[in-house]
Amino acid sequence: MGSYLNPGNFSFRGSLRSKIYVDKSELIVKTNEALCTEQKYICVSRPRRFGKSMAANMLAAYYDRSENTEELFHNLAISKDKSYKENLNQYDVIKINMQEFLSMSETMEEMLEMLKNYLVADLEETYPKVRFRDGKNLIQVMKDVFSYTKCPFVILIDEWDCLFREYKQNKEAQRKYLDFLRAWLKDKDYVAMAYMTGILPIKKYGSHSALNMFTEYSMTDPGELAEYFGFTEPEVFGLCDKYEMSFEKAKIWYDGYQLVEHKKEKEECHSMYSPKSVVEAMLRHRFGTYWNQTETYEALKIYIQMDMDGLKDSVVRMLAGESVSINIGTFSNDMTTFATQDDILTLLVHLGYLTYNVTDQTVRIPNKEVSQEYVNAISTMSWHGVADLLDSSHKLLEALWALDEEAVAAGIEKAHEEIPILQYNDENSLSCTINLAFYFAREYYSIIRELPTGKGFADICMIPRQEHLDKPAVIIELKWDKNTIGALKQIKEKNYGNALKAYQGKVLLVGINYNKKSKKHECAIEVMEK
């Protein structure tokens, strides 16, 4: 057993001993299928703390032929698969964390030299009887070992993209690094499988990837590996039940990453949760912001303040709960090459700050935890209109509960005045105004939009969450160049809308009218029992 060659199972054993361990071992079924085939090159990209390193440790423990690890896997799901015994402890494993080597070196060249020397040292120590043709050449050393053992390598590279995050501007260093990986891995018989994980997909130059032999599984196209990184909804439900925590709250805080797996018969959508956040919430018995503690909101701030091509407007709309159309095809898979706002939004998907809907090609903010990071970032930027509006949404909600019609009208008016994109030219803009003005209402309500296209009004229904049933339900109808009485009448004629069909209790009917000539808002509120 070496430091990098056949490193053992200590890390994975630690995962199994943890208070919370969610079995993702069926990932091994997929990697077993790829062994020694044209599909043996796999690259998985996910945000921080989504279980990438744990999965790499699991694969190392499973394939490492220097130890018998059956005791670690015999109770896991993989043990029931027909490929389990066939591949258990059958390969030489090389496992490296590129961030470790980068942290120990001053330049990219020094990092690669150190990596090659350390791997060669492990190989020579493990196989002293092998006659090495060139002890300084990593590729030749691995060829010599493979010729001697007839046992190919499973190569696991964690944090493969760290150089692109640390050397953002150094294109030459990036290119040399990719050239090294290609020379080391591509078309090599000694590779049974090359498995890389990172945050970014593989860097593209022009229309081509330097590592085009890899099959990529990313946040925008997770493929058949969708369910193995992050916690699925059934897994989170089981943890909430075990730790006596509210599943509804867990969903509000951490759900929202919709990863679609394309199958022969249908598309299967996996609702994924951040594992770090869910585990911390269960163990602390408190819902809060945990995933984002891995890096401050400054990381998000850097990108959303690049107000190119309407980026600020898109962020404001997403804060209001809307989705924004996006073209992910122009993204260069790095952190500096941005031609349009779509490239920045695509990067935010890979970083975990947005979720991508492959069906309608839109992005949105996934959950409360991530939304709070946007609020934190905006509060320190020059977006004063947005920051002030979010801050004052507390008072607007209290005014609504107090039936203060003038204060509610003033709050909606403030949103309309201070945010340039909120022009009343369609139903989406109407609802965006209401959602942003009542941003804080999400603490208490599920907010549902009903937008009859072309009718000149927008319905917003606020249904109290289970733990806030003491609050009234709310229906808001915003119209332009009509009147508030007509708005209230229309709510009643529609029997409160579809969203409140099953609701019983107190309902606030809120009619808001905008007069285009006076540019003033009027508000009328009625209290009803349903």
Predicted regions and their residues:
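Active-site metal-binding core of divalent-cation-utilizing nuclease and nuclease-like domains
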Residues: 144-149, 442-469
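Mg2+/Mn2+-dependent nuclease catalytic core
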Residues: 174-179, 480-497
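Short secondary-structure junctions
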Residues: 438-446, 502-504
